[in-house]
Design a protein with these regions (language model features):
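A conserved acidic beta->alpha catalytic loop
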Residues: 14-23, 72
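A structural signal for isolated positions on well-ordered beta-strands in alpha/beta enzyme cores
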Residues: 9-11, 36, 180
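Short, acidic, metal-binding catalytic loop of nucleotide-sugar glycosyltransferases
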Residues: 1-9
Length: 229
């Protein structure tokens, strides 16, 4: 990351990982002021980890916050395209740029057919229920404009796990954010195993459904004004 974007600071969020990530990060952070480590006690969920990173970026006064997985699935070579999308050739730019597996030029390597099918289905499910203006609603490789993140009530976020990805896009849409996507090729992790399990997946679908009902009710109120008395 630092070789690709030398001017960037890097925050590693470690939930007491047993593989020594925390110690590795502390050792390198002591020698490089661009690297920072946030240690949390135990597994608190993907959503809370990203929120912690967002809060850190806002507190530090950064213009943008970029989130990516640290398991070799997201290649740093895609970062410049995400940053470029925030400027949009001198125009207003986008408020969130998504590293997308599902736009032309994007893709996935190393997944079995059923996982492809599940991912496509969840993305369609989220787009329909939440009205999200993007093809990849569940990917974690994203760049956000902190000016727009400040508009969000992060304390109101319900998702602690993987459905956070869809929920924050829904909140950003409601806040008037401009969305963009740039193609990436996602590689299945080279080490370790995915932490998602059936219970987590069902919980994510339920949270997205509840948000979808709320989204429909808000839309209905706009379409059908309250009757006068």
């Amino acid at each position: 990351v630092m070789n690709t974007v030398p001017g960037a600071d890097v925050l590693v969020i470690d939930d007491n990982s047993p593989d020594g990530t925390g110690d590795w990060c502390d050792e390198r952070a002591a020698a490089d002021p661009r690297l920072h480590c946030l240690h949390r006690a135990g597994k608190q969920g993907l959503g809370t980890a990203i929120i912690a990173g967002i809060r850190y970026g806002i507190a530090q006064g950064y213009d943008h916050v970029l989130n990516m997985d640290a398991d070799y699935s997201h290649h740093p070579r895609y970062i410049p395209a995400l940053i470029a999308g925030m400027q949009d050739d001198g125009g207003p730019g986008h408020d969130v740029m998504i590293g997308s597996r599902y736009v032309p030029g994007g893709g996935i390597e190393g997944w079995p057919f059923m996982r492809h099918l599940m991912s496509r289905t969840v993305n369609l499910y989220a787009r329909v229920l939440l009205g999200l203006p993007c093809q990849d609603c569940s990917g974690a490789f994203r760049c956000y404009r902190t000016e727009v993140l400040r508009r969000l009530d992060l304390d109101s976020v319900r998702s602690r796990g993987y459905s956070f990805q869809e929920e924050i896009l829904w909140l950003l849409k409601r806040a008037g954010a401009r969305f963009g996507e740039a193609p990436i090729v996602f590689k299945d992790r080279e080490r370790g195993q995915s932490k998602i399990h059936a219970g987590e997946a069902l919980s994510a679908l339920w949270i997205i459904f509840r948000l979808g009902v709320k989204n429909w009710l808000v839309t209905l109120r706009k379409v059908v004004p309250a009757s006068s008395t």
